[in-house]
Amino acid sequence: MILFMTVVLISLSIFFFSTFSVDATTASVEYGYVKSLFREIAFSIPEILNGQTIYTRHPSSLVSLGFKKIPLNLTIQLELGNNTLVTAFNKTEFYALTGGIRRNVLEDVRGSIVYGVNQSVVSEIERLALVREYYYNGWTIIELDTARVYCSIYKVGDSNYYLEIIIADFGGYYNINDPPTVIGTGSIRLRYESYYADIKEFSPVRNLTIIFNQSIITLKDILPSNHSIDPVSGSLTVRIVYKKIAVLIS
């Protein structure tokens, strides 16, 4: 009887260990797939904003996809040529796409940046998206967000400049003003339509301030080194483009 119980206990131990090992392997594989997927989506954000639709499927027995709100105060203030100060843009939250799995699959639980740079203003459109991963309260979480500003400035003539600011966020698939649409977890579709865009243009602009939470970015921070706008003969045109990407997770 003792021998029988010993055999049963050993068999159960082997069974549970094997099940745990298979489960852990599945978790690692699925999370790795979603991690690569988020990286590819982040890399493709410029193409999506130009009208390309992305549709992918992924294994989803253990990993789940969704979204979260990111509280953020983003304000763009402009001083126009007639000394008028206007708030050209204001936004208090962004949406991040998220993936999560209820176990730790990270080598470093402090987390890391998978793609992009953690900056408030970027000068490359490819850096508009940020992907980071971290461990929190029993979950390994990966997030993709576009909560930053892309600035591109061009010199036109001797002392005239044209500044384009692009801001992007995620929205609902059937109603762009809603949060990202989540009705499942096995696939993700992202698309952008030009009529989603909100475009404003201001000229002449004497100064510019971007408030990003506690950070303040001025025109001097955006202008290339050794460049300045002549207060008499120079001019600055600012174009602000706000785009929303429709998301369907199903």
Over which residues does each language-model region extend?
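N-terminal single-pass transmembrane signal-anchor helix
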Residues: 1-19
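Intrinsically disordered, low-complexity regions enriched in Pro/Ser/Thr/Gly and acidic residues
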Residues: 81-237, 246-250
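Beta-strand/loop motifs with alternating small/hydrophobic and polar/acidic residues, enriched
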Residues: 13-140
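Broad, structure-driven detector of short, well-ordered beta-strand segments within folded domains
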Residues: 63-67, 78, 165, 236-243
